[in-house]
Amino acid sequence: LVADEADREGNIYSGFSTEDTPAIAEATKFNQGIVIVQVNKLVDKVSRVDIPADWVDFVIESPTPYMLNPLFTRDPAKISDERILKAMMAIKGIYGEYGVQVLNHGVGFDTSAIELILPTYGESLGLRGKICRHWVLNPHPTMIPAIETGWAENLYSFGSEVGMEEYIKARPDVFAVGPDGTMRSNRAFCQAAGHYAADMFIGSTMQIDRYGNSSTATKNNVAGFGGAPNMGCDAKGRRHVTEAWFKCGNEVANRAELTGECLRGKKLVVQVITTVSEKGFPGFVQELDAIQLKKNAGLDLEPVMIYSDDLTHIVSEIGIAYLHKCRNMEERMNAIRAIAGKTEVGMLEDPAETLRLRKEGIVKLPEDLGIDRSTATRELLAAKNMKDLVDWSGGLYNPCLLYTSD
């Protein structure tokens, strides 16, 4: 393991990115394993004890600090008008419609666009204080404007982000900052919170098949899922009620067939996708590349990130498909075709069927939501580049050189 500090007894301070380091140390030590920790420096007294000394066998002081790269930083300068349109639809057609209070955002430009238009577009809809109050989220730099304008009341983080340390320390009202003045992240607790407590998970994907299964594993790029399979599934053990969870559950078309008279909620699981990427790769496909990847790699299971039966909404630049409202697979496939654009899936769209689905609220286009496409411009971004994010933070955010922009 690597950490920031160790004292002479072997107590470990892991820094802002504690994540699941203590859990790994505990699991190893209590299974007759050996725990070795590389630390940046030895000190007389650690800032706080993240791993107790009796779980540690060896400590090595490194001549240079361990390497940590930014993972969650996205440059606002690279957010397109198309992503802003999708963000507007998501906020008005999902966040606002369901009153989403507790949520997790995946990593990417689509969710960064949402974060950056909360203080502008979200404010114009009068939604501050009504949505997006409690977050299970890494400290995304693109969240700074939303935090500074009172949208995000608290963020509980899986880990930290390079350059955000001083800003986090200055906002103990929002982040999990302890008496030592630093944040203690906890991946294990965040995974549990994201699974059971969150009203909604929303994230980007690379492929969605005709049934609604989603994956970021393609023949051109096998990207990791991160926490998406856990965040992006309905927790059947959940019993606490929130407005968004309860409303979504009561909209499930076949709920009476599944639970009879008993009421049940459902987590909103949203995938955001571009119908055809800038490189010409289709987002909607008849069959996921994951099917062939399973065969090629000799896997027991296709690397599906989110399964169709968990997915409640798809947002593309065409519109939103409310999949949980569909009565059967045929209707679900028609809803997907309606927002699939110029792809092999979208080419099978039946305009008459799409019109029916729009009338029933199963498919919503921007005009159905009262959104003027021409207003989806970068002018809505609360920060248009990295310097703007630094300014919003009062100079406390120190972005990695990889992400600096004019």
What label would you give each PLM region?
Residues 1-4, 132, 139-207:
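Ligand-binding beta-strand-loop-alpha-helix segment within the catalytic cores
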Residues 78-169:
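N-terminal active-site beta-alpha-beta segment that forms phosphate/nucleotide-binding
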Residues 178-256, 260:
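ATP/pyrophosphate-binding catalytic subdomain of soluble kinases
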Residues 1-102, 109, 116, 254-260, ...:
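Internal alpha/beta core interface subdomains
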Residues 45, 113, 143-144, 209-217, ...:
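Short acidic/glycine-rich loop or secondary-structure boundary segments that cap or lie
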Residues 403-406:
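Conserved small/polar residues in nucleotide/adenosyl-binding loops
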Residues 16-23, 118-127, 219-226:
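A glycine- and small-aliphatic-rich helix-loop capping segment at beta-alpha/alpha-beta transitions
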